[in-house]
Amino acid sequence: MKVIFNADDFGLTQGVNNGIIKAHQQGVVLSTTMMMGMDAEQHAVELANQNPNLKIGVHLRFTAGNPLTGHPNLTGGGEQFVRFNELWKKRDFQEEAVYQEAVAQVERFLSLGLPLSHIDSHHHAHTHPQLLPVIRRVAEQYRVPLRGSGLCHIDCDTTYHFTDEFYDQGVSLDGVMAHLKSLKSQYDVVEVMCHPADVDQHLLSISGYALLRELELQVLTSPILKQELAEHGMSITDYSTLISTRKFASV
């Protein structure tokens, strides 16, 4: 089985960026997704250019910061996106507003000269029932996978699964290995969501999920994790292992 450890939130803060790069250089992270238009975006670009083997996708924002398009349908009444807890209650998203914002974020990424690996979203916003069909269309437009568990269909030989078990109280080396071993007989490729970081004051001020990111970083850079993955016949990979199927993920 192949395992994609994808680090979310690249570009959120410099501490997050530094943690992701450590997890890449010293650990098992070969894939990350970048938040466009956030404070540490340029820092992330500099690090990306220094680490060409790190595959990077877009971590679409619909619950953090301001829309690049400024479209009022996407905000909570001010300049910022709707809050996370309000996103799931909202049922009046305008399809064109969502589409234009997603395209704006992807185009901003491409303008930086970075190859686009795949698409996912902050707080899993793309799984909102009104956003999902639009974001799936955007992924198909750019011919990249979209994070989710519906990647492979009847005519696809590769089975894929996304897991968010490595989060919060689920962060441990023993826990992630036990979970992966339980999936090995069912899937060819498993994506593990992760959030490594060197916690900085900026992160503490904007995120309710901060301190455990350092524990994630410890696990992801542990030599024991690499050893156990190898012992159980698991290899680390990135989204390029899925692109060759010419299928697009959905949830």
From Swiss-Prot:
Domain of life (superkingdom): Bacteria
Keyword terms of this UniProt record: Carbohydrate metabolism, Hydrolase, Magnesium, Metal-binding
Enzyme class label: hydrolase
Cofactor(s) it depends on: Mg(2+)
GO term, biological process aspect, one: polysaccharide catabolic process
Disulfide linkage: none
Binding site residues for Mg(2+): H59, H122
A UniProt-annotated Pfam family: YdjC
Gene Ontology molecular-function annotations: deacetylase activity; hydrolase activity, acting on carbon-nitrogen (but not peptide) bonds, in linear amides; metal ion binding
Matches recorded under InterPro entries: COD_ChbG_bac (IPR022948), Glyco_hydro/deAcase_b/a-brl (IPR011330), YdjC-like (IPR006879)
EC number: 3.5.1.-
Purpose of the protein: Probably catalyzes the deacetylation of acetylated carbohydrates an important step in the degradation of oligosaccharides.
PANTHER family, per the entry: CARBOHYDRATE DEACETYLASE (PTHR31609:SF1), YDJC DEACETYLASE FAMILY MEMBER (PTHR31609)
UniProt record similarity statement: Belongs to the YdjC deacetylase family.
HAMAP family assigned: COD (MF_01246)
Complex and partners: Homodimer.
Protein name as it appears in the record: Carbohydrate deacetylase
